[in-house]
């Protein structure tokens, strides 16, 4: 390209005759006869190049009957032929050849070169087209509605190998193409139908003339194709009984093809009669023949059918005796004299013999011959058929490898059916009876005999019959019975039936399979109908509810137009019931059991069942109400429920938890007043694993202390104390010990038992002389008090918050009364000595607390409830009180420690819906009010407990705080008096519920 937009001059070279640079168009394009006029003395041979040919095509409009279609090869051939004729005419006339481009050779060559370079392929440009363009749809991505896009050019779209366009050929790019599948399913078992050989051009070995040779070969191919289609049709009719309904279309297509070819085969037979003379074929003649079921050329029904050479392409066929068409059930077996057979037309035999001479051996013929020999060996060697003692006998046949049948095509389809029945009925029949196996069950033998008698009673032996309502159940019984037997026994049973009924064994097996398939379909249909009725009953109510929800939704949507959260659209939700699930599972089970009989080849069980659920079951509901995945989910749910129901009867003996050893030995080792041991052993502590050892150690120490309790009587200690209480005031009318009113009110703990028998207060027992009886009574009262505290602290304790005698009233009204009424017994001259029994251990469930501060606060409050005794006698001051030291601080046994956490402010949270049913102590039933014991209610696992406390007092009240400080001082005095040398002796005798025993200090 020159600068400034100026055009550059180019030198053009003219095309000369000897230049081979433009071999694409030919150096002699302007001189067609140049090659012939070239001198012969040239050493190099002249290269013959192809000429450009101009083809003129006339396009016409496409209508419903025709459309323009051109074959380039044929057009090229016709054009060359036309050019050759014109050349011959011009040569004969002696006129010189005229070249259309003789005037402007250079211009034409230049234009052709430019156009070839611009629009040509790789030959002109020198580079090939990319392979990816071959697999690209050039019409992809264009806007069909755009008028600028030109879609009038025809091009070949990408079409899969297994598909073809609906009408075939090429299309203008307008819309999507419609395809049809080229593959056709076929379940036939015939060898020649499975192995499809391509048709080859066969050469004739003998021919009289070229015209007759061409016509005979064409007729031969037509006759061969017609007979093959006839054989395919006859086998497809037999196989259609065991195939599914989808195969009926294939059979109808083959029938139509066969009827069209019958006329062509009739023409070929007439040509053989008129034009050919050859050797007679060997004909086997016996005394029996099958009557013709259709007329010959005359159209009438003669009593006999001529027998020709026995050449079959399918299987060994008897040439003389055949069973009549029992589908019609009217034609009996008739005989034909041998004299009539001898007078057969010789032209038919000659035609058949000529076929054998003309045909060449192909791979297809060899395969058929091998197949025929195999079938013959399977059926066994046979003798010549004849009539003897009224029984049919087998006959040996001359098997030919020819592809034609015995002129069946000219007699119509009815005659072919009769011949097919004769072949099926006689080729494998038994010559002797087969005894039933002795190992068969009695019900199988009964079913076989019943079926034989039913067939014989109707005189249907040797006839292929259609099963009716009576015969179908009998055959089904036989078929189902032998399915569970050995293969050899099953073959013996059907061989016996074959001989008795004169019907082929495979025919009975096929009929049995058909009956079983129908039975399985009937079961599935019955179950599906039950489900349909149940759904029809439920659906009206479901639809009405859905419509109501829709109206409600419309009202809410209209009311809340500008709301941020619009109401949800109701869904079509079908409510399943146990009955509907059961019916659905019945349909699933019926389909599952029919898989072996109704499934197609290479179809899995899941595909088989899912197809039925999707196509049949889902359609029972209105559109949009049911999906396949929902059906599968309900079936799975029903399966799981069914398995759980089966496992339930076995579960109780296996899953029953054994009773703890401590609970079993409870009547002998521990009193029933304390339920702490059971609470410790049965459920594990919900704390971390580090507290397990502490829990076990504490429980063991408590069990040891409970075992050391005195067994005075078989009755519980509570009842014993109750009996001893009335006797004590009579023995000692003048008490020596007396509790302060405040202390008495503060520490009086009622022992709550199952019988609601309250034990006497400690002030009643302790205001008596210090004798052995007093010590025993004091010990019993202390045991009862300790058991009460343990009972209150146990997780399984059920308390009544409405009663006045409970643990929460310890520091409420009693404390206020004590602080308001000072003790009248305290004087200046009397020294108060606080004595008491050993403190009882209290077990705290650490799972109810989150921090150590709450645990310490609770332990101090429990320690404040220790029995406090005030002594007013001087003699009591010198009495030594023995107190056992314990590892537990203040009578509190810690069985586990949580990591400390920062105390959080109490925030009243919203009530939760759930209530955790964990093991909780009786102390954990406190509501939102931090009442008598000062717990933090957030530590408890109770949210919506209906049990609330009665009127309680706030511990922040100054009056209550003063009372608490007085109690604390009394506790300190009690501890000092207990460890002083002059403490009261004998207070520790008989105590069994205290802390672990240690050496007594005196």
Swiss-Prot record:
Keywords of this entry: Centromere, Chromosome, DNA-binding, Kinetochore, Nucleus, Phosphoprotein, Repeat
Signal peptide boundaries: none
Keyword Thylakoid applies: no
Motif (Nuclear localization signal): 80-85
Region feature 2 X 12 AA tandem repeats, mapped onto this chain: 230-253
GO terms of biological process kind: chromatin organization; female meiotic nuclear division
Ranges of compositional bias, category Basic residues: 903-917
Function of the molecule: May play a key role in egg organization. May be a transcriptional regulator having a role in chromatin remodeling in concert with Hira, a histone chaperone. Involved in chromosome segregation by affecting kinetochores function in the first meiotic division.
UniProt protein name: yemanuclein
The organism of origin for this protein: Drosophila melanogaster (Fruit fly)
